[in-house]
Amino acid sequence: MTDRARRAFDVEKVTKRFYERFRTELTAFQGFIEGITDMGDRDWYASLMLNRMMFVYFIQKQGFLDGDVDYLRHRLDQLRATGTHGKFQDFYRAFLLRLFHEGLGQPPDQRELELDELLGRVPFLNGGLFDVHDLEQDYPDIEIPDEAFERVFEFFDGYRWHLDERPNREDNEINPDVLGYIFEKYINQKQMGAYYTKEDITGYISRNTVIPFLFTEAKKKCPVAFEPDGGVWGLLRDDPDRY
């Protein structure tokens, strides 16, 4: 077996092992959800929430969420430390939905000022994954206890999340292949006309997280280059595919 074939086999093995545990955790997460009466809708919402959190794990491990590689875990711990729990004051309502809908799902210039204190510096991820979902509109009283997220984070924290395709040196390293694999199992349905590939996922994360982050940091170093007539915009205008 060649090195390339062996690496591909190792990646597939880790991905499949992750997926088997994912199925178990998905079922457990479904059981925590309250406020959705239809079983099919509850299952779909559980899948949506775990898919959202997997995307977040990939970008937080690169430091793109307020510079914190354990962003979700730390925010959960901080909220629980306040002791202000109760209806609509748990992690799901008080923090996570606001992160999804008002943070990742909304451009920074459209956010409320108080949101920065709650979320810190987080990017805008265009594409719809973090928009208010139809299920969230149909079931406005959804509740998910903190214990559900503690369990998911414990599962996710057992893996090392990478955006690139580095050779697996350890058997707990995963890359966006795992998202493509799970989307294929849960989302790629002919009746929906929705198909996701590894390239779609990697490109989405790069376009909406890595590239904007790099431009923001570069602008801090050299603001003049980003003025309307600056060199950066000239390069982008003249040769957008290259730059």
Where are the model-predicted features located?
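Preference for the N-terminal adenyl/adenosyl cofactor-binding alpha/beta module
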Residues: 1-243
